[in-house]
Amino acid sequence: MAAPRGPRALSAAAPGSGKPKLTHPGKAILAGGLAGGIEICITFPTEYVKTQLQLDERANPPRYRGIGDCVRQTVRSHGVLGLYRGLSSLLYGSIPKAAVRFGMFEFLSNHMRDAQGRLDSRRGLLCGLGAGVAEAVVVVCPMETIKVKFIHDQTSSNPKYRGFFHGVREIIREQGLKGTYQGLTATVLKQGSNQAIRFFVMTSLRNWYQGDNHNKPMNPLITGVFGATAGAASVFGNTPLDVIKTRMQGLEAHKYRNTLDCGLKILKNEGPKAFYKGTVPRLGRVCLDVAIVFIIYDEVVKLLNKVWKTD
């Protein structure tokens, strides 16, 4: 009789078996990358508006009166495609970001499941935290820094970046590799807390829905609702860190000595409400993007389970 295998990581499963059907981390990397790429193409306009509002500091004075005004001015000046300016830099980062996130989550959960192969909420939070830190260091910080610099540059009176690769070359030439890692501390805090909250909520809701039947099928609609709920929780939990991260990665990042100094200056000069600028567009984008990512991820894993046998 074959010896029992050690636990791997959670995936969409076929009903009827005792323990949950588990996913190989390699499948998680492929499914996560595909989900991340599709999601960002759908949701980028709300990300663009959110970033514009956060960069629109009161002292300038403000250029936009709100979300609708930001959209109207952008479309009037640059057409509908203006809402997709900076997409390339974010798309290049979104695919590896989701791949690293899900791959690391599944890898960590290999070692944190109980004897029944179940991942409880607390361990889901810890795995999510590890996944968030990994994606922040490997992908998010450099790509988000480039994205914010691109959007900020293209809304200036004299844009200097002619394209993604030209912009990256100029940033590295002028500031070195350090120029792509501005706001690392804020990014690690933001992504770590983001994924900790999301995977905690998602794991809790999955466990509640499936009850004692670990292999109860998850309908894509249910997965989407759970994902949107997890996304909303993460928005209210860490929007202040997102605001600080955006300021630290903008073209005026030199105004701040470090993450703490940035937070204190925002509080002193603009008040507590400034930490929640861009919350409404971010809430819509995050709920949609987390729902989309989890739906696509689960469905791709189901497909991979049919063609890639890892048990």
UniProtKB/Swiss-Prot annotation:
InterPro entries associated with the record: Mit_carrier, Mitochondrial_sb/sol_carrier, Mt_carrier_dom_sf, TXTP-like
Transmembrane segments: 29-46, 86-105, 129-143, 183-202, 224-241, 278-297
One Pfam family hit: Mito_carr
Protein name per the record: Tricarboxylate transport protein, mitochondrial
Tissue: Expressed minimally but ubiquitously throughout the adult brain. Detected at higher levels in the olfactory bulb, neocortex and cerebellum. Also expressed in a subset of large cells in the globus pallidus.
SUPFAM superfamilies xref list: Mitochondrial carrier
Residue windows of the Solcar repeats: 23-111, 122-208, 218-303
Membrane topology, record value: Multi-pass membrane protein
Subcellular location: Mitochondrion inner membrane; Mitochondrion membrane
Key words, A-Z: Antiport, Membrane, Mitochondrion, Mitochondrion inner membrane, Phosphoprotein, Repeat, Transit peptide, Transmembrane, Transmembrane helix, Transport
UniProt-recorded Gene Ontology molecular function terms: antiporter activity; citrate secondary active transmembrane transporter activity; tricarboxylic acid transmembrane transporter activity
Function: Mitochondrial electroneutral antiporter that exports citrate from the mitochondria into the cytosol in exchange for malate. Also able to mediate the exchange of citrate for isocitrate, phosphoenolpyruvate, cis-aconitate and to a lesser extent trans-aconitate, maleate and succinate. In the cytoplasm, citrate plays important roles in fatty acid and sterol synthesis, regulation of glycolysis, protein acetylation, and other physiopathological processes.
Biological process annotations from GO: mitochondrial citrate transmembrane transport
Catalysed reactions listed for this entry: (S)-malate(in) + citrate(out) = (S)-malate(out) + citrate(in); D-threo-isocitrate(in) + citrate(out) = D-threo-isocitrate(out) + citrate(in); citrate(out) + succinate(in) = citrate(in) + succinate(out); cis-aconitate(in) + citrate(out) = cis-aconitate(out) + citrate(in)
Post-translational modification: Possesses a short cleavable presequence, which, however, is found to be dispensable both for targeting to mitochondria and insertion into the inner membrane. However, the presequence is required to keep SLC25A1 in a soluble state and thus in an import-competent state. Mature SLC25A1 lacking the presequence is prone to aggregation.
Sites bearing Phosphoserine, chain numbering: 156
Similarity annotation: Belongs to the mitochondrial carrier (TC 2.A.29) family.
Region of interest: Disordered: 1-21
Pro-peptide region(s): 1-13
PROSITE patterns assigned to the protein according to its UniProt record, in alphabetical order: SOLCAR
Cellular component terms per the entry's GO annotation: mitochondrial inner membrane; mitochondrion
Gene: Slc25a1
